[in-house]
Amino acid sequence: MAQKPNFLKKLISAGLVTASTATIVASFAGSAMGAAIQQNRTTNGAATTVDGAGFDQTAAPANVGVALNAVITANANNGINFNTPAGSFNGLLLNTANNLAVTVSEDTTLGFITNVVHNAHSFNLTLNAGKTLTITGQGVTNAQAAATKNAQNVVVQFNNGAAIDNNDLKGVGRIDFGAPASTLVFNLANPTTQKAPLILGDNAVIANGVNGTLNVTNGFIQVSNKSFATVKAINIADGQGIIFNTDANNANTLNLQAGGTTINFTGTDGTGRLVLLSKHAAATNFNITGSLGGNLKGVIEFNTVAVDGQLTANAGAANAVIGTNNGAGRAAGFVVSVDNGKVATIDGQVYAKDMVIQSANATGQVNFRHIVDVGADGTTAFKTAASKVTITQDSNFGNTDFGNLAAQIKVPNAITLTGNFTGDASNPGNTAGVITFDANGTLESASADANVAVTNNITAIEASGAGVVQLSGTHAAELRLGNAGSIFKLADGTVINGKVNQTALVGGALAAGTITLDGSATITGDIGNAGGAAALQRITLANDAKKTLTLGGANIIGAGGGTIDLQANGGTIKLTSTQNNIVVDFDLAIATDQTGVVDASSLTNAQTLTINGKIGTIGANNKTLGQFNIGSSKTVLSNGNVAINELVIGNDGAVQFAHDTYLITRTTNAAGQGKIIFNPVVNNGTTLAAGTNLGSATNPLAEINFGSKGVNVDTVLNVGEGVNLYATNITTTDANVGSFVFNAGGTNIVSGTVGGQQGNKFNTVALENGTTVKFLGNATFNGNTTIAANSTLQIGGNYTADCVASADGTGIVEFVNTGPITVTLNKQAAPVNALKQITVSGPGNVVINEIGNAGNHHGAVTDTIAFENSSLGAVVFLPRGIPFNDAGNTMPLTIKSTVGNKTAKGFDVPSVVVLGVDSVIADGQVIGDQNNIVGLGLGSDNGIIVNATTLYAGISTLNNNQGTVTLSGGVPNTPGTVYGLGTGIGASKFKQVTFTTDYNNLGNIIATNATINDGVTVTTGGIAGIGFDGKITLGSVNGNGNVRFADGILSNSTSMIGTTKANNGTVTYLGNAFVGNIGDSDTPVASVRFTGSDSGAGLQGNIYSQVIDFGTYNLGIVNSNIILGGGTTAINGKIDLVTNTLTFASGTSTWGNNTSIETTLTLANGNIGHIVILEGAQVNTTTTGTTTIKVQDNANANFSGTQTYTLIQGGARFNGTLGSPNFAVTGSNRFVNYSLIRAANQDYVITRTNNAENVVTNDIANSPFGGAPGVDQNVTTFVNATNTAAYNNLLLAKNSANSANFVGAIVTDTSAAITNVQLDLAKDIQAQLGNRLGALRYLGTPETAEMAGPEAGAISAAVAAGDEAIDNVAYGIWAKPFYTDAHQSKKGGLAGYKAKTTGVVIGLDTLANDNLMIGAAIGITKTDIKHQDYKKGDKTDVNGFSFSLYGAQQLVKNFFAQGSAIFSLNQVKNKSQRYFFDANGNMSKQIAAGHYDNMTFGGNLTVGYDYNAMQGVLVTPMAGLSYLKSSDENYKETGTTVANKQVNSKFSDRTDLIVGAKVAGSTMNITDLAVYPEVHAFVVHKVTGRLSKTQSVLDGQVTPCINQPDRTTKTSYNLGLSASIRSDAKMEYGIGYDAQISSKYTAHQGTLKVRVNF
């Protein structure tokens, strides 16, 4: 047989060729063998050796060795000695009826070893010391067998031409490791597998195994004799295996690794396999010395499919039988194979990385008698069919896959099972596997990652017996409890994604167990069997308020009396099911009052939550659930009393109460959300325990509903002490159903609309036991309201009932309404029991109506009405037909008050109104008291007769010109007293009031007619009112009635006091008064007297009286024309005419020394208060006091001359002299003068004269504009242009500052500053050109070449700050950016300015010849001017563009001339502040914008001389002239309302003389740079020139305002220095600084330079 190449041997021995690779290689070698086989050698000698002896011979007989790859047929009963070194032969065939000895003397490889001919016999193999026998099992094909040749090279068929199968080792008998270190190797060319192994039959036995090593390097080998266990070392390569299916000792035991033998796995990937088969009548107990596997290199399979078996640790169960207890010491795998009814028992510790439990058919049993541990990343897989596993010690199954099998792991008492269990890893949708705890136990995760589920879609976790099973982590499994004492204890954070007690245990039934929590936990499935047989007994929450039990199931079913226990610190139950119907069939037991939360906040209004059980405890020591949040669900609370501290109802949520008792301390809900339903289906009553609050005042419920009565007579709500109901609507489902019973005492509140919705009324209300009930909203009842046992019904809204009665006469109805309400009762056929009293406590009015025709008795009766608390101003309207003196009782009606009469607005009373009946007030009848005045009202055209001497009430009528009052209570020497007749001016008037006796009326008289009978005196006005509206008639026949008005009387302007007979009746005013009409021209009264001191009278109507005596009163003429007529009039106080007319119609009026006149002139309409003295009247006076004339003058002062207004008209009929005038001018017009004169016709008149020019001139003089040049002339021009809008707007100015600012902003300008800045811009450009000329003129001049210096800064014209460094080329381009900051202070009265300029000059020049240079340049500038002083706020922007030509000529030695011409265009944007007054004289700022173009042009010429003063110093004196001319275009301002000016200007020009010198130093070399320094100084003097005479006019103005003159200085001084830096002949850079100084003017300029020479 051909040998394998050496490299292949090395690969295999090194483990670099896998089992599959080796198979491919071996197959290749076999397929090539057909051509390689030479011989079929047969034995025939006594001493047979493969090197030749004992085999068939050649033709010339010789001992020829057996060729490699030959097959050997043993024909003779002689042993065979394989003595060829590294011999490799195809196989052995036993062809003799003897057991044949085979000795391996050299390392030998054999293929098959068969006894196919004589199968009763075998080859007995003996391996010599240190020798290796490798068996490949290579077979022979038919073609190969037919083609073999003998030693004589003659074809002799092998095995008669029949094939030998691969792996035919049936001929193997005893294998004797004759001497130490011999080795048997199974390296099958055609590897076998575990399912189809190479089986060594019963004849194959091991002898002297202690000397040998058995290597399985390729293929699966199954041995049948226990002697194989005696081999010193069995080595199994990756992917290969050995199967022990052996006989056993008398105890059916196979001892492995005994006596120092070992079974080793030599591979690196842990796929080598040791299989232990439990065999019928043979080995069933595998006794292991040490541990199998380890170092993660092999898999051990224990197979009891055929018969029960046991894998035992020889050292005892507490020792490892598989792997060792460390990461590297574990077996790579452990497989347990069982079958239906078969048991595999592992009596020792198992440490394997991966474990497989497989059952050929269902219900195989695996028992682990000690630890099972697959390690941190190990796995367990259940395969083939369902099996059961029992553990006895804490075990770690790692990542366990139940493989979609109904497998079970049973955990005994006090054992911890660790792992992460999956029902079907290949299909997560499947559910399989059960973990059963017999008693106490723990199920833990094997993963350090808390996000990894402990169980994932397994069927169940069972607690089958009494004990506590502790769970943690996340589980997707059903929890099953099989014993009443079974408990699942959930650690903090545990999640159960499954049901509880829905399915029977494996092998048992469910029972009512318990779930307890150590912290927060989640159970997503239903709890408790719906049939109730397996309902849960108890759920106990963690004793921690911060922990939550989340329940996601729709059915939470407890056993009878089952509880959910909230311990002392409470905890939260969170309900999250999305099913439509959710049932919690548990009692909620509360350990500590106001603890614990039920959170169903996630439920929607499409879901119904039913709680069938008690919540908390109601009793002497209430224990309430801290909070129950129902979300938006409909929640039904039934089958037990409920105690909840806070009931939270989400939007659209509803709670239904049944027939039990409910304590809800408070509800939390959005305003107008949430519904409570009372539905006592078992009996007709629901009870609200004391302290219940449904809704709140700030957040009422949407609805409280009384459910249908069903088969009951009524639906009754029994209300405990202190219960409050707040809802927008309180409704009843059935009409006339729903009754309230308040009998627990205390105070109850019912807030909301009670009944009436959809026409459904409630039934009855009953109050007993001293209970106070407040119905704050509208309430509608069909039945009666009964109040007994000192109870009080408080009504705050409309109230409807059949009647309101008190059987024991102790009931009180109290009105607490804040707005008007109506009480509607039915007329009764028989009298009802009287109320103790009606109390009014709120400020709202109450109307009591009666309807129906059942009888003539009233629906509510009482003899007392009491006003208390906040009822001041409230009105009670009694039912029609109840008078003040009857009220249906034997005694008159008593009206009491304790609310006083004072309010923030004055006097007020609570009132009772009757209608449809006349009343008589008897003397002694209790109506009000001295400190608590009440009101009596007539609601119809009926009468009241007052016989009480003192009536502590005012009387009024509701309807105008209805009701009569007769006042007869006075007695001789004691006038009667009443507190007003009518409520005030403008209110309804009595039709008639009659005073038959003297009276003090301490209030108003509001009557169409009030008659004061002859001889009767009435004093009116006081604490209850001071109004008089209507008419008072003095006297019943003779006109000799008298009326006296108290201090402060207010008569309506239309009121009238008349007399039944001319010149009779007196009217007296005791203090201040507004007076209406008194008497008339035909029937004057006898006298009108004003007797108060230091008082005043407002005259609103005409007064006709024989005597009018105003005393010292100050008179106010309130109406437009007041007439005084009669006999004599006396005035000795101020007459304030306002703008009205006082007419003296007749008689003589005498004015005393204190008389003065005050009038008001309103120029807007020309009205002036004045006095008219008609013919037949005379006014006599001496000299009056000061005449005060108030002028409200907003009128236009745009007039000339004098206007007049008459103050007293009557000429000589005014006999006297007015006092000196005092003018008080208000309004916006300051620009007129007023005076008082007596005209030629003797009338007194007021004059008004225009004074605008003087006012404005003074305003300007006292303002910042004062002293500004030209301002006085422009002010005169402005105020004389009276037809302009600006002038008219000025006249609204309120004060001198506003006036000055308005005018000053118009008549001053900034044109001088702008022009000077524009000229300076042109000079800046010329300076830059002079710099360039100063440099270029040095070109080719020997005298100056050495000293050539840099440029200077900005100076006038051609005065350079120094010349640039010498050029060595004929032409170049240059650019000089510059920045200038100039400040001109105020000078000569002309406002200063600040100007900032940025610009750049860019030039290009060339040498025309050696002495002449010419060039051109452009300049771009931007200047921002901010004007100062009185022009502060004005701004100007100037954007300029210029074009220039320049040149320089060298004259005679050291003399030169240079010059330039410039033309520039500037765009000017000017913004000037102006002002505007609104109609009220309020001043606002506006901006006048002017945009125009400016053109400036000119030139300059300078001559100079270069003088070398000393070595390194060049002095150049210079002198020259500059001329510039500037012209602005005309423009019109925009942006203001009245102050836009048209501006017209002419040209400006200027000629300057320039004298100065510059000094240049020699070149300084710094590193590689040449630096040229320079300093200079120049004087610039203005020789001649002028600024443009700019003129401006407003719209409508004819004479223009002129611009302000230039006041700036003529002489200025320039000082500067600069430096240029040159790095090479082409590039040059520079920097310079200049200061320009003159009187009150400074400017600073900085320049940069860059030049490129060509």
Curated annotation (Swiss-Prot):
Cellular component, GO, one term: extracellular region
Keywords: Cell outer membrane, Membrane, Periplasm, Secreted, Transmembrane, Transmembrane beta strand, Virulence
Domain Autotransporter: start-end pairs: 1366-1654
Domain of life assignment: Bacteria
SUPFAM superfamilies according to UniProt: Autotransporter
Removed propeptide positions: 1334-1361
UniProt-listed PROSITE patterns: AUTOTRANSPORTER
Tagged with keyword Zinc-finger: no
InterPro entries: Autotransporte_beta, Autotransporte_beta_dom_sf, OM_autotransptr_brl_dom, OmpB_passenger_Rickettsia, OmpB_ricketsia
Keyword Membrane attached: yes
Gene3D superfamilies: Autotransporter beta-domain (2.40.128.130)
Post-translational modification: The N-terminus is blocked.
Family: Belongs to the rickettsiae OmpA/OmpB family.
Function field: The 120 kDa surface-exposed protein is a major structural protein which may play a role as a rickettsial virulence factor and/or immunogen during infection.
Protein name according to UniProt: Outer membrane protein B
Lineage per the UniProt record: Bacteria, Pseudomonadati, Pseudomonadota, Alphaproteobacteria, Rickettsiales
Gene that this sequence comes from: ompB
